[in-house]
Amino acid sequence: MADGTINSEEMISASSFQRLIDIGIALSAERDTNVLMETILLEAKSLSNADGGTLYIRTPDNRLKFEIMRTDSLNIAMGGTTGKDINFPPLNLFDLETGEENHKNVASAAALTGNSINIPDAYENESFDFSGTKKFDEGTGYRSKSFLCVPLKNSQNQVIGVLQLLNAVDADTGEVIEFRPDIQPLIEALGSQAAVALDNQQLLESQKRLLDSFIELIASAIDAKSPYTGGHCQRVPELTKMLASAACEQQDGPFSDFELTDEQ
């Protein structure tokens, strides 16, 4: 930009930076976990122009659970708000017999090392086991080629999941290409935002569960004090739910405009 003009690459960079800011704001405001995870994957696919992708979440027993799957060209949409369960078993981060780290799978390797892995062509790669991918391709006629796996690290630098993108597509030719080096930092930045949002969401949910446990404990103690009011604290919430549900279903009358959000 020596002559004071802005070239196309700088415009794209500025646009992507603004896009990341907008995505970060949206992620921090989302309170539905399924919608949050879907947004993370869909925005990553959009930024990288990827045909498919998978979002894995790390479980307490050190496995990567499939949470969201998308492959546009095959019309595959599973997990999240779709209501379609993902039947693939979780990926083990450690061998169940030896306890050794599982670096054969590209997603588990990204989780274990904490580093992004960019593979131009899975069929030419000898570092990872893509036998499952090739079997999937044989059954669907698909051709899995380029992969980009990004670990999701929270504020404590702990890997809580993996974002895996599949088959970057050239916007001009429609050809499947490798994920460009300039795209990887964008996805990594998105991954950082996603990890913080997911971590905060998990923290909120754990706090809600703790609060619910305290309420149930107090209610049980109150009910146990008197044989005359036993079960009262258990019945009141159920009756309240029934009344609220009935009010929401009203099409006319004083409660026709009454509506509760999922969070409420």
Question: Where do the protein language model's features map onto the residues?
Answer:
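Signal-transmission linkers at sensory-effector interfaces
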Residues: 1-39, 46-47, 67-70, 203-217
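Signal-transmission/dimerization alpha-helices at domain junctions
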Residues: 2-3, 112-116, 162, 185-205, ...
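GAF sensory/regulatory domain recognition
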Residues: 54-101, 124-125, 163
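Signal-transducing coupling segments at domain and membrane junctions
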Residues: 65, 102-108, 115-146, 168-178
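A short, aliphatic-rich beta-strand micro-motif
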Residues: 145-156, 161
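Histidine- and acidic-residue-rich, metal-dependent catalytic cores
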Residues: 213-264
